[in-house]
Amino acid sequence: MAVHYNPITKEPYLQLPAPCTNIIITPYREHQIKEDAHAMTTSLNDPRVYTWLQGPPYPFQPEHGEDWIKTKIQENKAVVAALQNEFENKSQTEDSHQTENNIFDQCPFLCIREVGEDLSGAQDTLIGEIALIRYSFYEIRRNSWELALVQAHNKQLPVGHEDIVWTLGCTIRLSTLYYALTHPTDYLSPTHHGKGIMSRAVQAVIRDWAVPRMNMNHLRGSFVVGNVGSRRVFERNNFEEVGVFKDWLPENPKKSLGKMSIVIMEWKGLL
């Protein structure tokens, strides 16, 4: 079963493959907004994370996280409800394969969480985020008619269309502010770097959700030149380099960062 469900809350989630089966990917939760925002604030103010991210505001404040989480909860509410209905319907039939699964246009599984145990029972902690959205073709010259044309075409393709180009990442909109991203904001807490978690998170999102439930055929991603960890994540998931764009990201004085170059990667299919 690609999508798992908490038997008590009926929350849908993805589970990472071994040896990371204690890591799950869930939607954001209304009852954990403050806790998750605090975890986000800690990670996104760490130079081992924010150095490689163009979009999130810096310094990142708890209210930024709360606004973001509330937005994502609303965006994914319908998908989460549909999945819970699927779970309930399948539970009432002897053969779960009798129910046809819907095709969706978004991935509600954003929160990378580590599941632990304490005296009160099972708990989990937010340790990162992963997002899957329609690709923005940010390698094309900004504010050009070519960019507007390809973005409009990709956006207008109907749900499940095989020609949709997707990307790992997201565009951040916080309150009345707009932060235009030119590469993904996926991140992992530095306390969990170097353990293969993000590689397996990408694998789970692609294999267990994007391909079977979004009919995904085309996927691209990018990373800042010098980010060795991100390159490894892509390569382990069968991505190949298709281009390098020098000085593509503007200076970020708040982070004391100059212009940065990006590498575009393209997915070559399931391994």
What residue spans do the PLM features occupy?
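Generic, well-ordered alpha-helical segments
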Residues: T41, P57-Q61, V224
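Soluble or luminal CAZymes and related metallo-dependent hydrolases
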Residues: Q32, Q61-H64, F104
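Conserved GNAT-fold acetyl-CoA-binding loop/helix
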Residues: R48-D95
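Short hydrophobic/aromatic beta-strand element in the GNAT-like acyltransferase core
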Residues: A78-N101, Q106-R113, E129, V165, ...
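Acyl-donor (CoA/ACP) binding surface of acyl/acetyltransferases
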Residues: M1-Q32, D36-A37, S43-R48, C111-L271
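Short, charged low-complexity intrinsically disordered segments located at boundaries
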Residues: W68-N76, H97-T99, D118-L119, E235-E240
